[in-house]
Amino acid sequence: MNRRLSIGGITMALAVAWLVAGCGGGDDAPRFVAVPPAASQPEPGPGGGNGPGAAPAPRILVVSNRADLVSGGDALVEIQWPEGVDPATAKIALDDVDIAKAFARRPNGRYMGLVTGLKVGDNTLAAGLPSGSARITITNHPIGGPVFSGAQMQPWICATRTAKAVTVKGNAGSAPASATATTKASGLEGDPVDDQCNAATLYTYYYRKASAPTSCTFGITGGNACYTQYDPASMPADSEIADFTNDRGDTAKDLIRVERGTINRTIYALAAPFDPRDTSMPWAPPKGWNGKLVWQFGASTGFSRFQSGPTRSLFDASGGLGLQRGFMVAIASLTDHGTNANDVLGAETMMMVKELIAEKYGRIRYTIGDGCSGGSIKQASIASAYPGLLDGIQPQCTYADAFTPIIELADCGELQANYYANDPSGQALTAAQRAAINGHTSTGFCAAWISSFLPALNPSRAQNCGFPANFPLVYDRTANPKGLRCAGAEHAMSQLGSFVGDDGIERGNGVIDNQGVQYGLGALRDGALSAEEFVRLNEGVGGYDGDLVWQARRTNARRESIGIHYQAGFVSDGRQLAKVPIIDLRGNQAATGDIHANWRAYSVRDRLDRDAGGHGNQLIWKFNSSSGSSAPGAALARKAFVTMDAWLAAIEADTSANPIEAKVLSNRPAAAVDFCIASNGANDADLATTVGLEDAACPVKQQSSPRQVAGGPRAENVYKCQLKPLALGDAAYGGARFTDDQKARLAAVFPDGVCDWDKPGVGQVPVTPWLSFAAGPGGRPLGTAPVSVAAP
């Protein structure tokens, strides 16, 4: 199916006749490719061939994406001809079909074209001269996916123009076999045309009136909105349209187009400066667009099985900061963590949309990420596992990735929802002692986790999958053991894999483990716990089974389950995060309890220090707020955006051969340093007085977590620790004296030893970037990008 279905205004069908130019110069991989750099082409030998004495042959470059990751049936291609060759004499063929008319030399001097009609699978593109030929294999994937994420999750309920009841099939062996669910409304003008949820793209057009007051609200809705919708078939007169000058000095009419479509079984939307009277082809981008992209990631955590619309607004604070400077803004439901906590799917979707932008609008210079909480997870995870998709990230309400917060979440549940609540020894602990064990200023922090996200680990909770409560197809250990499991490990089963337990139930590879963890160790050392209270705590804490049911024994995760999380790139790695500038806007946590704890920004910093040898690429800008998820004030958000833009522009201009990590460090703006302010940064005056992050005057203080009190690293990226013998004379116990009975009881709690935090975790390995899960869970490196080769 041609992915370029469209509705509204003008049709954007990309035909073979779209001949490309103006996409940048030189042989370097364009920034919009955003995938591992293509392997260098062999240097031409005498006469322009591919080796000493070889006949002159062209070079073929697929520039909209890696040649093996193309989707949607088309690819932007450049052909570099040997010096002195007249391309008019050349033959260009796609699987032996002549497509020479798709190419031409453009004003930038590059010979380019958009190749369409690619079949799913391998396609051979050849360019030939009497003196020599070349060919490259382009592997095309369906516009509905997948590309590298592996087998797509089923069932998956496509969105429809208006919500309606549909029949949903359950897993094989489910009782019942099917049930009725209600679709999500798509916001499009037509229903899906296939089971990949593909539907026609909708375009809507807006202009800013020349008479609009300067006090109007930047957006398209509301009585004071700056923009008014129009029909491009009957445009307002130019005199009625305000002028707009972007950040590179280009002046155009203040016109914006919003594109809403489907890709990879999700719904995406783009907003960009766009005048429908211009050509606006990839070789002639919209005049008002500065070539930059802001990607807005949505918050929260969820494992939905429904196609739905994005949760972020293209015209919110971040989008407005970008659009007013000439940026394009992008959103997609699979990059909203509250819809999709599978960050491989998020990365794949982002790559596919960026390819679409490159082929439809032109070259992307660089991409800035933005998002709070789950939106910060998406940024860090994608930057770590799929470097190049994001060039700079602006996390707020930070978490380093999706699954390591489960460490604190499970610990809080085991401690506060069970030991403190149900065990007489736990009930006897004071609030101050409990807070000391938890690593928090109050027990409200664990309470916030337990009430908000502990249920997200429950595979029987239908709402986690987007279904109503008690939906009959969802897993129940007794009534429906073959039902749909609605937890994160199952949502990512194509990447993380699964196992069948002794009870015959298939479960995703999870990460909960507390073998060898000495809860309250720091509290014992500091005198907040007695030796007996420490022993009773570790005797009574227990653990969770595979269905989030508390049990008296501790949780002992399978080594294979733990290891695959690292192997598959689900734990963010400082080695990869060092490749992007990071500006972390750290709001103050709520004093009474907050899942967005201040220490989380330092978790990322600790990973950078441990993995990359420093954190010069990360800025932490603390501001005072009512909760950790509060948005920064307008002036602080603007300062972060402008600083990130300047940082990336400097990196873009750096033509040295230095690795990207070095370029990030050497091009950091001189004034870009850590700081803390006493307000939320609503206006410029709020930013005039700053103090250091650890200054006593900074209101944003750090805490820790139960696992850190137990001796774990602030990086909080060790699911399952390696063990060492119990040695109660160690300095870690702060000189506490244990009776023989207490020693024996601790030895019974830790028969195999206690955590050795000086060693990596079990199965803990560095991220291997750009894994493909097409061959199954665990992932395989993509390997070298395809290049053109001389053809006989």
What kind of region is each of these model predictions?
Residues L19-G22:
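C-terminal motif of bacterial Sec signal peptides marking the signal peptidase cleavage site
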